[in-house]
């Protein structure tokens, strides 16, 4: 009983940290795929998930992770991600420099 009272909340917190790491990793991966697209297109094209998903640029979102590109130009790129299983419902944002917040 006592062990379960300690272990179960810790396990839940551990799972949430893993979900949050997955959401951040998806932002990093979409940023790298967009960088490759912009290198191919001289930085002028919008980066969309349709363009970077698949063999050419390799982006594939993880299961249960929603990633949205909110600003598709290289100069002011922004994207968000959230893992649907994360109990804290934390939405992460990446800017044009690759910085992730929160």
Locations of regions flagged by a protein language model:
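Amphipathic alpha-helical segments typified by the pilin-like N-terminal helix
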Residues: 1-25
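Periplasmic/extracellular, small/polar-rich flexible segments of pilin-like filament-forming proteins
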Residues: 32-102
